[in-house]
Structure formats: structure tokens, C-alpha cells
């Protein structure tokens, strides 16, 4: 017990010392060249952050929703031995809800990439 406690104490102490050194060491000598952004040897003219299209975010969110649908539907076949009708009801409910959401998004024009 004492050996385990000693190993935990030593490893915690070494980790803390290394974290403190890694935090304070770069702050001792800040170099302006290292702090400036690098764009292929040219001085940066504008902001490095370009705005994204709202269409891109909408398609990304739709992708995440359908990815979540797959994650919810994959374990359902293993639940058939408990109650097959309940499993089918859950699967149809998930699919119908996502289909209704997709149709709504389609009718609102959210899937059109070009305006």
C-alpha cells in the first residue's frame, strides 16, 4: 500500500513539475516573428478566419442528424429478442421523424446549395 501511494505521489509530482515548466518556459522569451501568423512567406493582409456559408452549416447539421440516426438504429437488431414489435415501433418512429424533418427542410429550400 505504501509503495502504491509513493508511486502515485512521485508521478503526480513529476507531472506537475513538467506542466509548470512547459507553461512558463515559452513565456520567458517571446519572439515577435514566432508570434506572427505565417502565410507562405507573405505578410498577412486580412483575417485568417473566413466566414462560412450558412448552407454549409445546414448541410453539416443534417449530416450529423442522419449520422445519429444510424447510431440509434444499429443496436436495434440486438433488441429483437426482447420484444420485436417494440423494436420495430422504435425503428419506424425514428425513421418517420427524420423523414418528416428532411421533407420539411427540402420544402423550405434548405437543401438548395445555390441561391
UniProtKB/Swiss-Prot annotation:
It is found in: Mitochondrion membrane. InterPro entries: NADH_UbQ/plastoQ_OxRdtase_su3, NDAH_ubi_oxred_su3_sf. Belongs to the complex I subunit 3 family. Its main location: mitochondrion. Core subunit of the mitochondrial membrane respiratory chain NADH dehydrogenase (Complex I) that is believed to belong to the minimal assembly required for catalysis. Complex I functions in the transfer of electrons from NADH to the respiratory chain. The immediate electron acceptor for the enzyme is believed to be ubiquinone. GO terms for molecular function: NADH dehydrogenase (ubiquinone) activity. It is a multi-pass membrane protein. The keyword Nucleus does not apply. The keyword Nucleus does not apply. Keywords: Electron transport, Membrane, Mitochondrion, NAD, Respiratory chain, Translocase, Transmembrane, Transmembrane helix, Transport, Ubiquinone. This is NADH-ubiquinone oxidoreductase chain 3. Coiled coil: none annotated. Pfam families: Oxidored_q4.
